[in-house]
């Protein structure tokens, strides 16, 4: 059966954070969602990539996926938002989009490596959910190989940057000497770890990690010489921080407007900067309306990040050449006849059988076995193993199916009994 590759989704270039946060899926949500969506889409192969900057559904299907209907029913997105922001790519356009994502060419920060890890995590979740078949398996393995190739053959990975780096960079507009400053990081995941590392390198005076799970906060805090808090303790310590980074996944604001007002009062209204890297938002956006409280979110960061793009444009152009080559290779594979897939599979199985028996023979020879006996035994086993499946198939053919028997006889140049 010939499938078509589809990509449907929402990304930072065309969808504001206020809409993207309605489409944020936790790993648990994804595991529960994929089998249900697969059943609704007539058994299509499906992978869901959900990050701060994008939610994208990848399909391999012989019919167009009915994702819009599912989104209406299972998310808070409105019909107007869906029509305005949903993108749909098919075949070559879809394949090249995935390859650009894997290489970091579609990221908020051009060439950032974090997305490849997120893509691999999404792949593992889809494998666990059982929603990946041979088409998406090949497509995503291809994308991983391409991303590795581009990293090694171009300068796309030089001077590494990330959303976390851009968030820390933004605080330079307000602070010079970090050895006199205190920072709070809300969350303990990958983005929080990057922020902590950057601040640690800047010789931050005091670093506080607040997380839902105290044990994870303690682990991160220990790695950077910081202090750990549980989330319920955050309000009591908020006034201590000059800068607060939101890096958690949460359904409610982790810092409300009232919490920020109280913190400002306790610190005699001295400057505080909030950097919200969370999707959904970690911080109440009304905080930005308060004097001496400045809030920046992912949409604000996009403006800063644009300045960093120029240094990677040349490498991106080189990467596009590899993307075209890899896309052609994958699309040529999709156009192969089913017989070619079958032949390749049969040959691969035969090669594996030969290789295993050859290794056994080498071991026997190394132990001093008689070479003639080893070769005779190997050839006997090889013959039996290669003929096992065809013989089992012949045994399974009903005697009255003369046409089937004739095809098999012709294939193996054998005579049918009269």
Swiss-Prot record:
GO terms for biological process: protoporphyrinogen IX biosynthetic process from glutamate. The keyword Cytoplasm does not apply. CDD domains: NAD_bind_Glutamyl_tRNA_reduct. PROSITE patterns: GLUTR. The active site is at residue 52. Pfam families: GlutR_dimer (PF00745), GlutR_N (PF05201), Shikimate_DH (PF01488). It comes from the Bacteria. The record marks 97 as: Important for activity. NADP(+) binds at residues 187-192. It catalyses: (S)-4-amino-5-oxopentanoate + tRNA(Glu) + NADP(+) = L-glutamyl-tRNA(Glu) + NADPH + H(+). The keyword Cell membrane does not apply. Keywords: NADP, Oxidoreductase, Porphyrin biosynthesis. Gene3D superfamilies: Glutamyl-tRNA reductase, N-terminal domain, NAD(P)-binding Rossmann-like Domain. During catalysis, the active site Cys acts as a nucleophile attacking the alpha-carbonyl group of tRNA-bound glutamate with the formation of a thioester intermediate between enzyme and glutamate, and the concomitant release of tRNA(Glu). The thioester intermediate is finally reduced by direct hydride transfer from NADPH, to form the product GSA. NCBIfam families: hemA. Homodimer. Belongs to the glutamyl-tRNA reductase family. PANTHER family: GLUTAMYL-TRNA REDUCTASE. Possesses an unusual extended V-shaped dimeric structure with each monomer consisting of three distinct domains arranged along a curved 'spinal' alpha-helix. The N-terminal catalytic domain specifically recognizes the glutamate moiety of the substrate. The second domain is the NADPH-binding domain, and the third C-terminal domain is responsible for dimerization. This is Glutamyl-tRNA reductase. The lineage of its organism: Bacteria, Pseudomonadati, Pseudomonadota, Gammaproteobacteria, Cardiobacteriales. The gene is hemA.
């Amino acid at each position: 059966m010939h499938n078509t590759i589809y990509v449907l989704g929402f990304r930072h270039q065309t969808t504001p954070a206020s809409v993207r946060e309605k489409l944020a899926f936790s790993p648990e949500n994804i595991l529960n969602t994929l089998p249900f969506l697969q059943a609704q889409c007539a058994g299509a192969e499906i992978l869901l990539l959900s990050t701060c900057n994008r939610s994208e559904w990848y399909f391999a299907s012989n019919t167009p996926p009915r994702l819009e209907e599912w989104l209406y029913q299972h998310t808070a997105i409105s019909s107007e938002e869906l029509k305005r922001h949903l993108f749909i790519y098919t075949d070559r356009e879809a394949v090249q989009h995935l390859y650009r994502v894997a290489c970091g060419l579609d990221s908020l920060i051009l060439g950032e490596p974090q997305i490849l890890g997120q893509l691999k995590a999404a792949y593992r979740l889809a494998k666990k959910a059982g929603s990946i078949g041979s088409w998406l398996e090949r497509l995503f393995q291809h994308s991983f190989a391409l991303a590795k190739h581009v990293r090694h053959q171009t300068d796309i990975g030089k001077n590494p940057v990330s959303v976390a780096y851009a968030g820390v960079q933004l605080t330079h507009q307000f602070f010079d000497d970090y050895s006199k400053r205190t920072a709070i990081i809300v969350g303990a995941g990958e983005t929080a770890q990057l922020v902590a590392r950057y601040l640690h390198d800047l010789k931050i005076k005091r670093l506080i990690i607040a997380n839902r799970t105290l044990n994870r906060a303690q682990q991160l805090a220990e790695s950077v010489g910081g202090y750990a808090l549980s989330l319920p303790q955050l309000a009591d310590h908020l006034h201590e921080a000059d800068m607060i980074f939101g890096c958690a996944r949460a359904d409610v604001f982790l810092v409300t407007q009232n919490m920020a007002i109280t913190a400002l009062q306790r610190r005699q209204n001295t400057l505080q900067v909030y950097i919200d890297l969370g999707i959904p938002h970690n911080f109440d956006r009304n905080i930005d309306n308060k004097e001496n409280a400045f809030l920046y979110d992912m949409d604000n960061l996009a403006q800063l990040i644009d300045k960093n793009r120029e240094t990677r444009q040349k490498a991106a152009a080189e990467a596009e050449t590899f993307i075209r080559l890899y896309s052609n290779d994958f699309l040529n594979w999709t156009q192969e006849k089913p017989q070619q897939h079958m032949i390749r599979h049969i040959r691969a199985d035969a090669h594996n059988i030969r290789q295993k028996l050859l290794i056994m023979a080498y071991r026997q020879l190394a132990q001093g076995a008689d070479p003639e006996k080893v070769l005779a035994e190997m050839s006997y086993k090889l013959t039996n193993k290669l003929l096992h499946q065809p013989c089992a198939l012949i045994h399974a053919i009903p005697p009255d199916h003369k046409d089937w028997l004739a095809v098999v006889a012709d294939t193996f140049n054998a005579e049918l009994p009269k």
